[in-house]
């Protein structure tokens, strides 16, 4: 069995005697390796830094502290430890890529984004720029890079730093297109994941899970595949994902350990302390630990994961055959990335600044600043100083009308998690006081349902007859809100809100109307998902249990319908009275589209492609049309409904649905969130299934397997594999890819037409380019 050192070809184990002084704060237990080509990396970084400074001057950007953000330290270069086994001919370009990523991140304004080991690390506020300027830079870079990648159309960026960054990516892909494209896919996935959630009011376990999913770990690993020239399939990566995720978790928590003072300082200066996303901060805020206690916990958690990784790797090695050599290199590279990053962070100026404006006393103000009662961290003693701290009580469990267990704390906390809906409730004068306050309504608390004070006056004894003649009392909304609050708390990319903002660049809707339209679309979308999951018998939604698995079918339906009432109320508050007619019109279309889907499934009737498109335009396209029509109705500029924009949104709805159909069968990430080929379990007539039934020699076999099952049972795994094999034989997935490529080209043509009529919209262009099939299908 090869040892870890045997796998390394271009590096040697670190000699701690070579480092003076030795980093005092280094605690990782992983072995650390050092590249034999350190000088080349340092030289390449120095030259790139000089060019970047000149480009910043040309662009008028304030970047006078690059020395704190660069990869080079007084002991060496980040890459010599993080990517020690980089093949010699790629060392210089890899050094440039790392510096480019750090410098770019250094300009980002502090808005609550994550700080990551491999790509986005803490930055100095004095070097950051405004959100508006950063948005302009990002769009300039994104359009140039994605246009070239998706369509081969080369567009030179306007900013000098973007010209440098785009050239780095071009060189990166040119050296190795296979791993280069894979790297870009992971980079985009990392950026998408960062948009999904913040970490306020989150448990430690959930925090670690979220950080692994949203951090730059997979991005850094994909760079490692490029640096080390590792050729590994997605299936092989998936087979050892449990080990790479374990390594990433340790590295991410290590980053939290080293970066906390820096991150706190950034957020304190920018007034965003409520959005700091760091494990030390979470343990202080949600669990009441001091900074020292929290850092000790983080350190233990890192070491635990490192030991588990080493044990897991050794166990895997004992049973791995000679054909797994590339997987072994992949795993060792991942471990080296984490160990090298930890060594670098233990002494890099980026994490050990002496010019912070805040102190340990300032950071201590986070202790106990949770939104509710403090949590208890399993496996660790409570904070030493518990004076004045209220521990979170254990939630009592109740059963709903369908016998499903639900926790009362989930109900009581729903308004905390539900940002959009909670904002609506606060602005609605028809709603009474909530969550334990006395008013005309009852409340649902950890002690159970509490009667309103007025009603209690009529019920002085259990045998009182007064309750039968008491005045009307409006019931509390907590129980009705709870299922919606749950689905609204799940991670989401918020793409519809983003699209609304981008369309508004054309339509110029007043801020108050735009906010209401966002609420309308958001609530309508989530309520439709609650109903869809019931109608499709889906067990998962966004990688978490579907709403009805917690709250039961009856309560979930009631909550979804209750949200429709809220949506109608919001629509009536828009300025243009025509908005209610628009809403009714598109809601009618949405339900008609859904009825087609359900009808075909119930009667096992395969629709034609033309019928499928009609269903998509009504069901999926309904929300897109609703967005556009409401924006147009509320627009502050006199402009008729634009047909070019309407076509753009129609094609966008089709692309979303067909992409979803394809990913359901072909994406490992989708499988983790919804299950393996879930559309087969639902009996859904997706585009791939319609194509298969139109081309296979044995359509009856497929329909018999799909529709002659015991209700409520999933299609057996072997049958799913059979259907996928049949799709392979008739090239169904290849056809789906061709449709997506064609549809995306038409989308971009429709955007060109819309821009010719309405003016350029870089935000919409970047968003649509980012959805393109090149990254999706690679």
From Swiss-Prot:
Which residues bind Mg(2+) 4 per the record?
A: 532, 536
Please list the residues that bind Mg(2+) 3. Answer: 532, 536
Q: Which reaction does it catalyse?
A: 4 isopentenyl diphosphate + dimethylallyl diphosphate = (2E,6E,10E,14E)-geranylfarnesyl diphosphate + 4 diphosphate; (2E,6E,10E,14E)-geranylfarnesyl diphosphate + H2O = preaspterpenacid acid I + diphosphate
A biological process term (GO) from this entry = terpenoid biosynthetic process
Q: What outcome is recorded for mutants in which this gene has been deleted?
A: Abolishes the production of the ophiobolin family sesterterpenoid.
Where in the sequence does UniProt note compositional bias of the Polar residues kind? 429-445
Task: Extract the Gene3D superfamilies matched here.
Answer: Farnesyl Diphosphate Synthase
EC number(s) of the enzyme? Answer: 4.2.3.-, 2.5.1.-
| Amino-acid positions noted as binding dimethylallyl diphosphate in the UniProt annotation, renumbered to this chain | 541, 619-620, 657, 664, 674
The entry marks the following residues as binding isopentenyl diphosphate, namely 493, 496, 525, 542
Q: Where is this region: Geranylfarneyl diphosphate synthase?
A: 360-774
- Give the residue ranges for region: Disordered: 423-445
MF terms from GO for this chain are:
geranylgeranyl diphosphate synthase activity; lyase activity; metal ion binding
Indicate which residues the UniProt annotation says bind Mg(2+) 2: 105
Residues that bind substrate: 105, 255
Q: Which domain of life is it from?
A: Eukaryota
Q: Where is this region: Substrate?
A: 211-214, 259-263, 350-351
Role noted for this protein: Sesterterpenoid synthase; part of the gene cluster that mediates the biosynthesis of aspterpenacids. Performs both prenyl transferase and terpene cyclase activity, converting isopentenyl diphosphate and dimethylallyl diphosphate into geranylfarnesyl diphosphate (GFPP) and then converting GFPP into preaspterpenacid I. C22-oxidative modification of preaspterpenacid I by the cytochrome P450 monooxygenase sttB then leads to preaspterpenacid II. It has still to be determined how preaspterpenacid II is further modified to produce aspterpenacids.
Please state what the protein is called.
Preaspterpenacid I synthase sttA
Name its species.
Answer: Aspergillus terreus
Q: What is the lineage of its organism?
A: Eukaryota, Fungi, Dikarya, Ascomycota, Pezizomycotina
